[in-house]
Amino acid sequence: MDERLLSGESAYEDSDLEYSLRPQTLRQYIGQDKAKHNLEVFIEAAKMREETLDHVLLYGPPGLGKTTLANIIANEMGVNVRTTSGPAIERPGDLAAVLTALQPGDVLFIDEIHRLHRSIEEVLYPAMEDFCLDIVIGKGPSARSVRLDLPPFTLVGATTRAGALSAPLRDRFGVLSRLEYYTVDQLSAIVERTAEVFEVEIDSLAALEIARRARGTPRIANRLLRRVRDFAQVRGNGTVTMEITQMALELLQVDKLGLDHIDHKLLLGIIEKFRGGPVGLETVSATIGEESHTIEDVYEPYLLQIGFLQRTPRGRIVTPLAYEHFGMEIPKV
């Protein structure tokens, strides 16, 4: 898979930046109003009862702020957060080590929770329900099970694939929040806030232009701002203007709707070779040289969101909106 400026997945260079930009409270957090308002109520109620917050599952496309919300939950509850990920927990013993290190009330954040192995999920069930850990000591006929009490804690799981979670695990979360793509106005506010942190002057129209091309995703908006800032410093006077922004994004091959060369390759491949479809996923994969799961999980969601692509039982179909975007005529049936 090509490295993508417009990928919602976190890249190495994003991590330090995201930490410095991360809001600390729900009041500072821009967007996701429905999830935010519900969490405000649940957190306040838990604090009034002097209880831990119910376990929380945050799901939705990458780059929308799941990690940020997990940290905010811990801050609002006044507790520490311990962070790990599904792929990092390889054995039940790894999970046991994490759980036994928690202090009362702590938040345990597991990113990519859908990638937990089923055997590890089974260790997690009693921990989530009864705050206890069942471990097996010894092997064979002499093996015995020992139950350890755990301090009350809140598990916050994050996933881009809620459907990949097993039903028993999903059912143990008391709070389920789907994170939605951001509006242009919300992203524009995020871009202006990030520019303040960078100590970079930015025109409001330039912030809007970056927001329009950021695919509804704050991580992409901040990444685009970083690249446009480079052009402003080298090709301009340091101020991010509309002119500099349009020039930079054109050179970066990010079009007015936030589509890049990979999106163009996928859509034009279906249009030019298969008359717009329907065409099967495996055929599209072979045509553009990308793995089918990458197309399905990474490239297609935004194209579906903006109505440029349809998934049908017969295959993928490019819509009239995409033809219009490319200035092409729709083929007659």
Curated annotation (Swiss-Prot):
Location of region: Head domain (RuvB-H): 256-333
Pfam (any one): AAA_lid_4
Chloroplast in keyword set: no
EC number(s) given by UniProt: 3.6.4.-
Keywords on record: ATP-binding, Cytoplasm, DNA damage, DNA recombination, DNA repair, DNA-binding, Hydrolase, Nucleotide-binding
Binding-site residues, DNA: 311, 316
Region ranges (Large ATPase domain (RuvB-L)): 1-182
Catalytic activities: ATP + H2O = ADP + phosphate + H(+)
Binding site for Mg(2+): 67
Region listing for Small ATPAse domain (RuvB-S), in residue ranges: 183-253
UniProt KW Phosphoprotein keyword: no
GO cellular component: cytoplasm; Holliday junction resolvase complex
Molecular-function GO term, any one: ATP hydrolysis activity
GO-annotated biological processes: DNA recombination; DNA repair
Membrane-spanning residues: none
Domain notes: Has 3 domains, the large (RuvB-L) and small ATPase (RuvB-S) domains and the C-terminal head (RuvB-H) domain. The head domain binds DNA, while the ATPase domains jointly bind ATP, ADP or are empty depending on the state of the subunit in the translocation cycle. During a single DNA translocation step the structure of each domain remains the same, but their relative positions change.
Subunit details: Homohexamer. Forms an RuvA(8)-RuvB(12)-Holliday junction (HJ) complex. HJ DNA is sandwiched between 2 RuvA tetramers; dsDNA enters through RuvA and exits via RuvB. An RuvB hexamer assembles on each DNA strand where it exits the tetramer. Each RuvB hexamer is contacted by two RuvA subunits (via domain III) on 2 adjacent RuvB subunits; this complex drives branch migration. In the full resolvosome a probable DNA-RuvA(4)-RuvB(12)-RuvC(2) complex forms which resolves the HJ.
Protein name per the record: Holliday junction branch migration complex subunit RuvB
Species of origin: Bacillus cereus (strain G9842)
Record lineage: Bacteria, Bacillati, Bacillota, Bacilli, Bacillales
